[in-house]
Amino acid sequence: MEISGSRILVTGASAGIGAVLAELLAERGAQLVLWGRDPAKLDAVVERCRRSGAQVSAHSVELSDPDAAEQLAREVERDLGGVDVVVNNAASPMRRRVQQLTVDELRSTMAVNFESPARVTMAVLAGMLERDSGVIVNVSSFGGRAAIPAEAAYCASKFALCGWSESLAMDLWHTGVRVRLIIPGAIDTDIWGRPGNDPAHFSGDLEPPSTVAEGIIVAIEGERFEHYLPDMSAVAEFKTSSIDDYL
């Protein structure tokens, strides 16, 4: 899909991947609706986007409430006259061994990382189908393709998003609506320092958010369903071919 002139909703846009993506989309002439958790940071992103001449609106949203997320998505669809591209980018970490994980932590992680993206998509999908055009971008994680120690809830939510995306792509195959699944690796965002999480096991180098943001641009404009950013597909393929060795 051509980005210029497209009406694009981006969640998780107040920092990290979403903030960088918003600026790239603004530079390409998109009309943007940005959602984020931090109003001050979100306002700063909006200001930077407007310097490119983009039309931008923003909403402070808490995606742990899927009902509210769905309702706001319906309002955005109505107010814009349609959403051409939705980028479900927002995510919440949950680094906790399953022995210490609480039901509330599990429920909240699933709400932010899976249920809200699914319901936002459902809220704008009818309009896309009516126009026979649209792109749904779901930002999952390498943890949605291969398990990570002490991240059972997070991995479960991201595995769910991957499965949802694959089925969504199949169901929409004969329509003009396309689905893109993004699999980021270890990216340098605030997800590593969020309070209420145990220390991360990962200690390697982190990729800049631009690696993923630029890859999402390619995904929107291109034809390929799945995008590993950076390319870690070989590790996921090894896990699939030999799960016992991977574990």
Regions found by a protein language model. Give the residues of each.
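The beta1-alpha1 cofactor-binding region of Rossmann-like NAD(H)/NADP(H)-dependent oxidoreductases
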Residues: 39, 60-71, 103
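Residue(s) in the substrate-gating loop at a strand-loop-helix junction
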Residues: 141
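Conserved glycine-rich Rossmann-like NAD(P)H-binding loop of the short-chain dehydrogenase/reductase
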Residues: 28-45
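C-terminal helical subdomain
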Residues: 181, 197-236
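Active-site helix of classical SDR
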Residues: 121, 157
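Substrate-binding pocket helix/loop in short-chain dehydrogenase/reductase
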Residues: 97-98, 102-107
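Conserved glycine-rich cofactor-binding loop
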Residues: 14-16
